[in-house]
């Protein structure tokens, strides 16, 4: 799959037609965090459930200063008509308005540039469609996380929200989040922080797990 972004790469400042008009990506993001997520096609079952859940969680992303934007190879007109189905799926008034815009990439220019095409899934003309990609960008416009799912597997937007919370926390504090971490759970002290410095940085206490190796690298502290 040509194109693509690596962690730390700056988001391209592309222009695109969307359901809220023409945008320039960096201007749209401003100083916010951003989630750019693609889906294979409008008017399809898995995509409808995904964007429905994304719409439900939009207030949670917004209060964390995260802007969302979707993308597929369908037209703006299709996006707007499909938005009615998404809102109806959510049990809401079937309007054309979603809490985030959807990009029209019917020429696949962005999908190719960003490495979003799924070679195993093709449209009626035999052309590959967009995979289920998630890119998370920081306020510096650099890629902080990427996830790539095939067309047959829907994403977990609650997990994407959890990841955002972790990324924002670890960007501000010298901690890491362990396996299955949830907001409010204890976090891990970075192994690069000396013991005495850790005591000053984390006044709520640092708790070290004793291990057979005798190495004191499993250090927990309450979430700052």
UniProtKB/Swiss-Prot annotation:
The remark listed among the other comments is: The active site is a conserved redox-active cysteine residue, the peroxidatic cysteine (C(P)), which makes the nucleophilic attack on the peroxide substrate. The peroxide oxidizes the C(P)-SH to cysteine sulfenic acid (C(P)-SOH), which then reacts with another cysteine residue, the resolving cysteine (C(R)), to form a disulfide bridge. The disulfide is subsequently reduced by an appropriate electron donor to complete the catalytic cycle. In this 1-Cys peroxiredoxin, no C(R) is present and C(P) instead forms a disulfide with a cysteine from another protein or with a small thiol molecule.
Name the segments for region: Required and sufficient for targeting to lysosomes and lamellar bodies: 31-40
Positions modified as N6-succinyllysine?
209
Reactions catalysed: a hydroperoxide + 2 glutathione = an alcohol + glutathione disulfide + H2O; a 1,2-diacyl-sn-glycero-3-phosphocholine + H2O = a 1-acyl-sn-glycero-3-phosphocholine + a fatty acid + H(+); a 1-acyl-sn-glycero-3-phosphocholine + an acyl-CoA = a 1,2-diacyl-sn-glycero-3-phosphocholine + CoA; 1-hexadecanoyl-sn-glycero-3-phosphocholine + hexadecanoyl-CoA = 1,2-dihexadecanoyl-sn-glycero-3-phosphocholine + CoA
Free-text description of this protein's post-translational modifications in UniProt: Irreversibly inactivated by overoxidation of Cys-47 to sulfinic acid (Cys-SO(2)H) and sulfonic acid (Cys-SO(3)H) forms upon oxidative stress.
Q: Which organism is it from?
A: Bos taurus (Bovine)
Q: What is this protein called?
A: Peroxiredoxin-6
Residues bearing N6-acetyllysine are: 63, 209
């Amino acid at each position: 799959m040509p194109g693509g972004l690596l962690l730390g790469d700056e988001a391209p400042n592309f222009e695109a037609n969307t359901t809220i008009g023409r945008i320039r990506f960096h201007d749209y993001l401003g100083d916010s965090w951003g989630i750019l997520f693609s889906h294979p096609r409008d008017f399809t079952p898995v995509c409808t459930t995904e964007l429905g859940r994304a719409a439900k969680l939009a207030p949670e992303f917004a209060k964390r200063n995260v802007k969302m934007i979707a993308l597929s190879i369908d037209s703006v007109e299709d996006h707007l008509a499909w938005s009615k189905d998404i809102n109806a799926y959510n049990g809401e008034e079937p309007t054309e308005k979603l809490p985030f815009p959807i990009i029209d990439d019917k020429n696949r220019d962005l999908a190719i540039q960003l490495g979003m095409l799924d070679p195993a899934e093709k449209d009626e003309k035999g052309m590959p469609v967009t995979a289920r990609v998630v890119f998370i960008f920081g306020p510096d416009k650099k890629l902080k996380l990427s996830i790539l799912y095939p067309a047959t597997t829907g994403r977990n937007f609650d997990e994407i929200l959890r990841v955002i919370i972790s990324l924002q926390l670890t960007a501000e504090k010298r901690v890491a989040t362990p396996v299955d971490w949830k907001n409010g759970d204890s976090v891990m002290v970075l192994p690069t922080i000396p013991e005495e410095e850790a005591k000053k940085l984390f006044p709520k206490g640092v708790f070290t797990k004793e291990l057979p190796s005798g190495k004191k690298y499993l250090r927990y502290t309450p979430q700052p």
